[in-house]
């Protein structure tokens, strides 16, 4: 299934407009933000390991994850629950709590190592240089304070301005994110706003200090498709006009096809495939990614049953000895059950983004060789499965 097919189906629901390869690589609109500098990684995550040390054992929620975020681009993190997407984001934000801990790797923000900052140093950059939008705005906003005051608090924490100046900034950011009657909404409580408006408040809070990077953890999951389309357009506008880099965590491959520039597919705490968005859809390589795309319902299909990848994400306390996906993969061989594959490069786009796949099928191959590997979804018969739900490393 190529990207255009996914977009056609997604746009039928959201009313979005498909991008072409050219404007996905050059930007849908001219980028005017200071951060929109070609070829610069504003955030790098190198070999990150975040483990949870529980009474039952060690849970490798994030294991050897490397992600590069160019300035002014949207990076998609996709995969099933339990894949490590949210835990990667929480590690970057310094929000892991006991018994979770970053045990290895390096996180660099604009050239500065932020992996092990103390609480005071972390507070200086969180919400200021890097911010996060959480999945459910109703639980992220304090119900007993007006939403305007909550956004104002972030400004007063990071900027030397008066309360009156901070209030004016809040009203301006409410206008930018499309909140009607911003002066009135400043004094509204969360329960007085719709889900879409609450999410716009959260986006405004994340953007008010003009951070270099914004992490959006499934920001449209609780919204209807009309509001989802509005939020996605807003995120693209922030990227295009302000040069903001965005990490978008989602299950929705249609959303990925619509807004993302680069994609990382995660499974059981590891990156299984990474590529420029067009390359991922046109040259889908890892059996897991193929299965995800094959699972998308087709509008013109007469099939009575939807395709699924059999089995569940493995229990992170009892991962397979070999490839994390081997128990669900129809292409698994004896080697896959005993050895863990590395990330093998099979090509690169014009901007230097490598297409990499964590699968022995592509070991030592280039893009031309990779094209010869059989495509399509995996034979959805699992070699084995203990049937247990994974530890929550989503």
Tell where the protein language model's regions lie, with residue ranges.
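The feature captures the beta-strand-to-loop junction immediately N-terminal to the Walker
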Residues: 78-79
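Short catalytic/signature loops enriched in Gly
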Residues: 180-183, 274-382
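A short, proline-enriched helix->beta-strand linker immediately N-terminal to the Walker B motif
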Residues: 208-212
């Amino acid at each position: 299934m190529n990207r255009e097919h996914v977009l056609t189906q997604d746009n039928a629901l959201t009313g979005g407009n498909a991008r072409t390869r050219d404007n996905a690589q050059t930007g849908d609109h001219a980028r005017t933000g200071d951060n929109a500098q070609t070829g610069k990684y504003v955030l790098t995550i190198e070999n990150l390991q975040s483990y949870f040390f529980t009474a039952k054992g060690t849970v490798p929620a994030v294991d050897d994850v490397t992600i590069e975020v160019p300035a002014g681009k949207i990076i998609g993190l996709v995969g099933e629950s339990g894949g490590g997407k949210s835990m990667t984001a929480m590690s970057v934000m310094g929000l892991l709590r006991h018994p979770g801990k970053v045990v290895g790797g390096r996180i660099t923000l604009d050239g500065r190592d932020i992996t092990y900052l103390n609480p005071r140093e972390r507070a200086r950059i969180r919400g200021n240089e890097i911010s996060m939008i959480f999945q459910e705005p109703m639980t992220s906003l304090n119900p007993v304070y007006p939403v305007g005051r909550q956004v104002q608090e972030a400004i007063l924490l990071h900027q030397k301005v008066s309360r009156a100046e901070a209030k004016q900034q809040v009203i301006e950011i409410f206008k930018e994110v499309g909140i009607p009657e911003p002066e009135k909404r400043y004094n509204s409580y969360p329960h007085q706003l719709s889900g879409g408006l609450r999410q716009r408040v959260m986006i405004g809070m994340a953007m008010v200090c003009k951070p270099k990077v914004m992490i959006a953890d499934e920001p449209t999951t609780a919204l209807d498709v009309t509001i989802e389309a509005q939020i996605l357009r807003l995120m693209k506008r922030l990227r295009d006009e302000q040069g903001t880099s965005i990490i978008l965590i989602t299950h929705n491959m249609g959303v990925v096809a619509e807004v993302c520039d680069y994609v990382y597919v995660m499974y059981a705490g590891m990156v299984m495939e990474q590529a420029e968005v067009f390359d991922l859809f046109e040259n889908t390589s890892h059996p897991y990614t193929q299965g995800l795309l094959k699972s998308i319902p087709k509008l013109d299909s007469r099939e009575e049953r939807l395709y699924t990848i059999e089995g569940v994400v493995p229990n992170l306390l009892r991962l397979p000895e070999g490839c994390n996906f081997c128990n669900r993969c129809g292409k698994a061989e004896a080697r896959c059950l005993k050895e863990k594959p590395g990330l093998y490069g099979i090509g690169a786009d014009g901007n230097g983004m490598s297409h990499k796949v964590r699968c022995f099928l592509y070991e030592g191959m280039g893009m031309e060789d990779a094209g010869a590997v059989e495509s399509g979804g995996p034979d959805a018969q699992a070699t084995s499965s203990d049937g247990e739900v994974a530890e929550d490393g989503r």
